[in-house]
């Protein structure tokens, strides 16, 4: 797992080069948006239970077969596993957002997840739909201008959306 700074320095070091002006500019922008990044992570973390439960509720309303007898979320044990998995994906999205790098999400959460779901008979499209619902809820919370560092947050919002999209694509 690398943060954005470690990744840039490692890449330059591997090439035996100094950091370029564009790399320094990108790192400066990351520092400048640091409070917005922390605010976004705090907001998602503070609302994690609601994000997960509302996304699951919406998913099961759209796909009621999941919670009916024989469905992949039928029985409290399977429902708990589904909610746990959604929470884990959301948690790793916050880690990626905080570090500004998707490697923690990829390496520790998404790597092999599709294969695991296939082996367990879990419908990947349903998991992807749940991830998209979490994305919508999280972005609504992050985009709320009240009580957050003022300024343009569009880059962070796009970054967060990209992490959710990456997670949805990994399980679909």
Swiss-Prot record:
Disulfide bonds: none annotated. It is found in: Cellular thylakoid membrane. GO terms for cellular component: phycobilisome; plasma membrane-derived thylakoid membrane. (2R,3E)-phycocyanobilin 1 binds at residue 82. Contains two covalently linked bilin chromophores. It holds the Pfam family Phycobilisome. Keywords: Antenna complex, Bile pigment, Chromophore, Electron transport, Membrane, Methylation, Photosynthesis, Phycobilisome, Thylakoid, Transport. The modification N4-methylasparagine is found at residue 72. GO terms for biological process: photosynthesis. CDD domains: PC_PEC_beta. It comes from the Bacteria. InterPro entries: Globin-like_sf (IPR009050), Phycobilisome_asu/bsu (IPR012128), Phycobilisome_asu/bsu_sf (IPR038719), Phycocyanin_b (IPR006247). It is a peripheral membrane protein. (2R,3E)-phycocyanobilin 2 binds at residue 153. The keyword Thylakoid applies. Heterodimer of an alpha and a beta chain, which further assembles into trimers. The trimers assemble into hexamers, although these were not seen in the crystallographic studies. Part of 2 PBS rod complexes, the conventional CpcG-PBS rod and a photosystem I-specific CpcL-PBS rod, both of which include ferredoxin--NADP reductase (petH). Interacts with rod linker CpcC2 via the latter's N-terminal PBS-linker domain. Light-harvesting photosynthetic bile pigment-protein from the phycobiliprotein complex (phycobilisome, PBS). Phycocyanin is the major phycobiliprotein in the PBS rod. Belongs to the phycobiliprotein family. This is C-phycocyanin beta subunit. It comes from Synechocystis sp. (strain ATCC 27184 / PCC 6803 / Kazusa).
């Amino acid at each position: 797992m690398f943060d954005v700074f470690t990744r840039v320095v490692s890449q330059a070091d591997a090439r035996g080069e100094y950091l370029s002006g564009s790399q320094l500019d990108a790192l400066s922008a990351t520092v400048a948006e640091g409070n917005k990044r922390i605010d976004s992570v705090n907001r998602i973390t503070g609302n994690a239970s609601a994000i997960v439960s509302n996304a699951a509720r919406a998913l099961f309303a759209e796909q009621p077969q999941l919670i009916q007898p024989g469905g992949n979320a039928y029985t409290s044990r399977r429902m708990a596993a589904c909610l746990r998995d959604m929470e884990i994906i959301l948690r790793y999205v916050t880690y990626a957002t905080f570090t500004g790098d998707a490697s923690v999400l990829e390496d520790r959460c998404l790597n092999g997840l599709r294969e695991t779901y296939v082996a367990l008979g879990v419908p990947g499209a349903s998991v992807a739909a749940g991830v998209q619902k979490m994305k919508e809820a999280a972005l609504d919370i992050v985009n709320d201008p009240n009580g957050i560092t003022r300024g343009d947050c569009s880059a962070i919002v796009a970054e967060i959306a990209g992490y959710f999209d990456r997670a949805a694509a990994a399980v679909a």
